[in-house]
From Swiss-Prot:
Organism of derivation: Salmonella schwarzengrund (strain CVM19633)
Pfam families: Acyl_transf_3 (PF01757)
Name of the protein: Glucans biosynthesis protein C
Recorded topology in the membrane: Multi-pass membrane protein
The enzyme's E.C. designation: 2.1.-.-
């Protein structure tokens, strides 16, 4: 445990916040894309589909690298039990709060919008359970994965710490090319696991909890560990904060491959396995692209940026039901996809910010949506 706090990583704080807030244009553009969602516009937009695919191809990989970075930083700062408790509370409490307050009403709304209320009694017990698993976890899935990764990483982080204490500091002798090969092989390994499951027991891949707890965790754990290693080895972090033409070109080629796979791939064939390999390496390359841009443009302290850093989780939590409401009741009345998309951004962001300001003034809600207990104000002793 270290009592000396690490210097503030302003650009990483900012990147994490903007990746969270990107969820708003991501889900609003999903309404206007060619992808089938809960609610869709009458006519899809090719450029909003392209925009949506680009965000989806890299956003969460970069997010989990940053999460791993900060998780290990705090691991060195707190005793083990306190670290686990703090980390799980910070993500677990908002997740458990959002289920009854946000995703349950969202589920009920969708039942009426999609006219499925009459079909609910006809579902089997498992079908009801699985539907609720998908719909109640919904956009909160990454919080569940973070709880799992935090728990799993106890042993891994402890091993990292012991190696730091017993070994002399040395550079992480690994290039971006070697990392690319490693993540390519990890993508193939993940694809192989999925294909084996598809052959042996394909039905389990449609199970919501299995998808969130097992498949999503398996995919994102390399990025989480990479973030921790970037904290341990400053030279590794420097590789990500230094612009790489190879990573930029590689990410562009990977995105083209991603689009081609989306266009010509088949879910009954190898589309999902191919996508996992592509997004694994593209995620790595986009870490370099995003970190280097963020380090150059966002590595400063700003009250406005700090506001959105603090607000990003709450805004992300509430934006999803707001987006679905907009898509169900407002989108049909707007003929232009561009105007609809812009109106959606204003509608969702505006209401989310109002709700954020309201919740800040209610201590219980502030705690439930942040997982942070209220800070006790120490009384000052009067000086005579």
């Amino acid at each position: 445990m270290s009592s000396v706090p690490a210097p503030r990583e302003y650009f990483l704080d900012s990147i994490r916040a903007w990746l969270m807030l990107l969820g708003i244009p991501f889900h609003i553009s999903l309404i206007y894309s060619t992808h089938s969602w809960h609610v869709n516009s009458a006519a899809p937009s090719w450029w909003l589909t392209l925009f949506n695919d680009f965000i989806h191809a890299f956003r969460m990989q970069v997010f989990f690298v940053i999460s791993g970075y900060f998780s290990y930083m705090l691991f060195l700062r707190y005793p083990l039990k306190r670290w686990w408790k703090v980390r799980v509370e910070r993500v677990g409490i908002p997740m458990l709060t959002a289920i009854p307050l946000l995703t349950l009403p969202q589920f009920i709304l969708l039942q009426y919008v999609k006219e499925k209320t009459e079909n609910w009694p006809t579902l089997s017990a498992y079908e009801k359970y699985n539907t609720l698993a998908w719909e109640l976890i919904s956009h909160l899935w990454f919080l569940l994965v973070l709880v799992i990764l935090t728990t799993v990483s106890i042993g891994i982080f402890t091993w990292f710490q012991k190696r730091q204490e017993t070994s002399k500091p040395r550079p992480a002798a690994i290039s971006l090319a070697k990392l690319s090969l490693i993540f390519f092989l990890l993508g193939i390994a993940y694809a192989a696991i999925r294909r084996i499951i598809f052959i042996v027991y394909p039905a389990i891949l449609s199970d919501g909890m299995f998808n969130f707890i097992v498949m999503q965790t398996l995919f994102y754990v390399p990025f989480f560990i990479l973030g921790a290693l970037a904290f341990i080895h400053p030279d590794l972090k420097a590789r990500f904060t230094t612009p790489s033409r190879g990573c930029t070109l590689g990410a562009a080629v990977a995105f083209i491959a991603y689009l081609l796979n989306q266009r010509y791939g088949s879910g009954d064939a190898w589309m999902y396995e191919t996508e996992s390999v592509i997004t694994m390496v593209m995620g790595l390359w986009m870490v370099n692209v995003v970190f280097s841009l963020g380090h150059r443009l966002l590595n400063f302290q700003s009250a406005r940026v700090t506001y959105f850093v603090n607000a990003s989780l709450f805004i992300y939590l509430v934006h999803h039901p707001l987006t679905l409401f907009f898509g169900a009741y407002i989108t049909p009345h707007i003929t232009s996809n561009l105007i609809g998309f812009l109106c959606g951004l204003i509608f969702v962001m505006g209401i989310a910010l109002i709700l954020y300001e309201i919740h800040l003034r209610i201590p219980l809600l502030k705690f439930l949506f942040s997982g942070k207990p209220p800070v006790k104000q120490e009384s000052r002793a009067a000086i005579g």
